[in-house]
From Swiss-Prot:
Function: Myotropic peptides that enhance both the frequency and amplitude of spontaneous hindgut contractions.
Protein name, entry field: Orcokinin peptides type B
Family, per entry: Belongs to the orcokinin family.
Domain of life of the native organism: Eukaryota
Source organism: Procambarus clarkii
Length: 266
């Protein structure tokens, strides 16, 4: 009986010690910071962003995607463009700004479709805006209806205004007289003239020599040092062919409608 009471007393003592906290258990696992970030108290996962997605203006540098916010801000060295409707400066980017505000652009591949006039330099495509401006060293042409100068471009100006052209491959289809030099195609004038290589033409009994196409322009003008011929309606002298034996040793002819003297021929 005494032993049973002693055992019961020992068990009660151990229970009291355990309740008092003298026997330490292993600490419970606390959630990590990463788990808190990935799973907030409501249990929904949090989406992580590398770039800003707020709707407020801020600066961004050296990132691949763009800010679609509707606020103006500065951007440098990024690949895509800002679609916001506010004016801002852009440098060295590949695509264009579709906003309707005027701004300056430099060294970009595509063009600004906005309806505001601005300067453009060293770009491949053209400005479709209806404002006059200067263009240099570009491949395509300006479809605007304003007169301007063009140099060193491949295609032609379809505008109806007279202007000067130099060193281009195609011709001016406008109905105005102008000078042409060093171009490959021809003038489609409807006037009679003499042509080399003795190819008679309709009733005018024209002579032709070493040319492929003709000038469709209806105005007389001067031509020098070009591969094809002038279709002006004026007579002139040609060297080195049988009809004019006093002329000699020249490759192409002068399409001007006036007589002239040539020197330093063999």
């Amino acid at each position: 009986m005494t032993a049973q009471m002693f055992t019961i007393a020992l068990l009660l003592s151990l229970s009291a010690i355990a309740a008092a906290g003298t026997i330490k258990t292993a600490p419970a696992r606390t959630p990590s910071t990463q788990d808190d970030a990935s799973f907030p108290p409501d249990g929904a996962p949090v989406k992580r962003f590398d770039a800003f997605t707020t709707g407020f203006g801020h600066s961004k540098r050296n990132f691949d995607e763009i800010d679609r916010s509707g606020f103006g801000f500065a951007k440098k060295n990024f690949d895509e463009i800002d679609r916001s409707g506010f004016g801002f400066n852009k440098r060295n980017f590949d695509e264009i700004d579709r906003s309707g505000f005027g701004f300056n652009k430099r060294n970009f591949d595509e063009i600004d479709r906005s309806g505001f006039g601005f300067n453009k330099r060293n770009f491949d495509e053209i400005d479709r805006s209806g404002f006059g401006f200067n263009k240099r060293n570009f491949d395509e042409i300006d479809r605007s209806g304003f007169g301007f100068n063009k140099r060193n471009f491949d295609e032609i100006d379809r505008s109806g205004f007279g202007f000067n052209k130099r060193n281009f491959d195609e011709i001016d289809r406008s109905g105005f007289g102008f000078n042409k030099r060093n171009f490959d195609e021809i003038d489609r004038s409807g006037f009679g003239f003499v042509k080399r290589v003795y190819v008679p033409r309709y009733i005018a009994n024209l002579y032709k020599r070493n040319f492929d196409e003709i000038d469709r322009s209806g105005f007389g003008f001067n031509k020098r040092n070009f591969d094809e011929i002038d279709r002006t309606g004026f007579g002139f002298h040609k060297r080195d062919y049988d009809v004019f034996p006093d002329k000699r040793n020249f490759d192409e002819i002068d399409r001007s409608g006036f007589g002239f003297v040539r020197r330093n021929v063999e």
